[in-house]
Amino acid sequence: MPVFDVQLANKYFEHPEKVTGSFTITEKLDGFRLATVIHNGEIKFYSRQGQLVEGFVEIEEDMKKLLKIASLSDIFFDGELVDMDCENISSDENYKRVTKIARTKGEKRGLKYNIFDVLYYDEFVNQKCKSKYVYRRTLLNMFDNAIKSVNNIIKLPHINILPVLYNGTDKSMIMKYLNEARDNHKEGIMINLDDKLYEFKRTNNLLKVKVMQDADLKIVDVYEGTGKNIGKLGGIIVEFIHNNSTYRCECGSGFSDEERVDYWNNPNKILRKIATIQYFKISKNDNRGYGLRFPVWTHRIRNDKSEISMN
């Protein structure tokens, strides 16, 4: 079994020029990434880092049914685990439930596997995809039709083929479906470029568009980075307000290399200043407090403000 990474998306708003020609929009799920490798009828599950994970007994049983229905033996699926009740709970609650179950030792029940990409087994083993997304989507649709064709006889409640929201060339549909995701309290959408191949790394062939909010927060501290950012700014500590109480959290994404050097050597340029931070949502943390999910530095220091504003 090769050591591998799954395909990871770059951010659409940083690479909007990459969307040319036909593309497919699907929902961005907020769960636990899971890759499935099927060879000679044997089913194995792997994390996004390519590590073997076990215990998904319900999904494995449904996958065995799918193998018989679709006459499969050698295939690679990529997808996301969500809670079985995900349609009736918030994205944040779904994420909490899924990660808790996925990290449980032994059997892991109560999850649904949403499959959003597929490769032939030899493509996976050689780590080289030969099929454009438009063809891979056709394969997924075939599996979806196979599942639906026997739905009255054989139930597969723990497997779902992620549906297409839009396919075409109209880029205005990106904001349309992003706004719908926001209104439905979803995390965002994914843009699959129809003429691109699956890559086992972060790539512009797949782009994510998240629903984000803005807040003007106070910078109260800085911290050093790790790895390539040793001796540079790793991020900032910001204060925000929730339910009339003040909380703190780290923000390490969005800084340019120049900013990381400058702000680490000259922290007073940003300390005690108000800056605009983007984030997905406010969520509870393990310390019974609150934090910001996916906070991102926007390069905007608000010299016209001195107070925190969550609006």
Regions found by a protein language model. Give the residues of each.
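Covalent nucleotidyltransferase
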Residues: P16-V150
